[in-house]
Amino acid sequence: MVELAKRHPEGSFICGHTGGNWELGVRIIRDTKNVYAEVAGSDPTSGFTEMAVRELGAERVIYGSDVGGRTFASQVAKVIGADIPDSAKELILGGNLRRLLQPSLKAKGYAS
């Protein structure tokens, strides 16, 4: 993912499940500013969201539900229960994805 993102700096990339190993995944993408960490899929381990925000900034963390793999409650609890500011939770739970999709939505007439 990192190599692909470096070859295409104009693009934005979402690292689903943060690469499968969240601690390693967050650290690997840390210096690649056009890669975002999606925090679905893993067990609701304490500290996951806090680490992602600390290492990447809330602007590069995106919520994912992992529907079918985990319960909705366990996945959303990783963000809602995290020890981060409410403003960071708002970005993670929708603001960041909305910002990333805005150009595409606007081009298709779904946003102004």
Please describe what each predicted stretch is.
Residues 17, 37, 52, 66, ...:
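Conserved, mostly hydrophobic/aromatic
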Residues 58-60, 71-112:
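Mid-to-C-terminal alpha-helical segments outside catalytic/metal-binding sites
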Residues 41-45, 63-68, 89-93:
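Short, surface-exposed, polar/charged, turn-prone segments marking secondary-structure boundaries
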Residues 1-62, 109-112:
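Catalytic pocket-lining loop regions of alpha/beta-barrel enzymes
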